[in-house]
Curated annotation (Swiss-Prot):
Belongs to the polypeptide deformylase family. GO terms for molecular function: metal ion binding; peptide deformylase activity. NCBIfam families: pept_deformyl, PRK00150.1-3. The active site is at E131. This is Peptide deformylase. The gene is def. GO terms for biological process: co-translational protein modification; translation. Its cofactor is Fe(2+).
Amino acid sequence: MAVYEILKMGDPVLREKAKPVTRFNSNLGRLIDDMFDTMAAARGVGLAAPQIGIGKRVCVVEVGKRRFELVNPEIIEAEGEQCDAEGCLSIPDYTGRVKRFQRVRVKAQDRKGETFIAEGTDLLAVAFQHEIDHLDGILFVDRVENDNPEE
């Protein structure tokens, strides 16, 4: 498997809206496997294809023992609120507090094109939202809450 270089903030690819996947073949499977390897090598919990320079709607998430490959994901239900510190493999050495939904349901496809629903709460919900934001050209720094309400 290959480990890709992760693009850093400032690279224009990170600000582009990724295109839907329409071909479900062995190339997609290899990409997903390589994304899991890249994420693990970087010690992350999620990685979106645009972070490795590929403008497709693909992301991978691993929280605890739960591992997800999300192709063409969309949030179909969300509730609650949480505001916690986030970081990003594309923005090393920076964290900020981000307001996110506490629970989300995501409709996505797997590498074979099969549709499924994934539900996440707490950190898993944050990871889903963070990676789907990447697919829309949004970085977590765009959503950082002001830590000092008097500023």
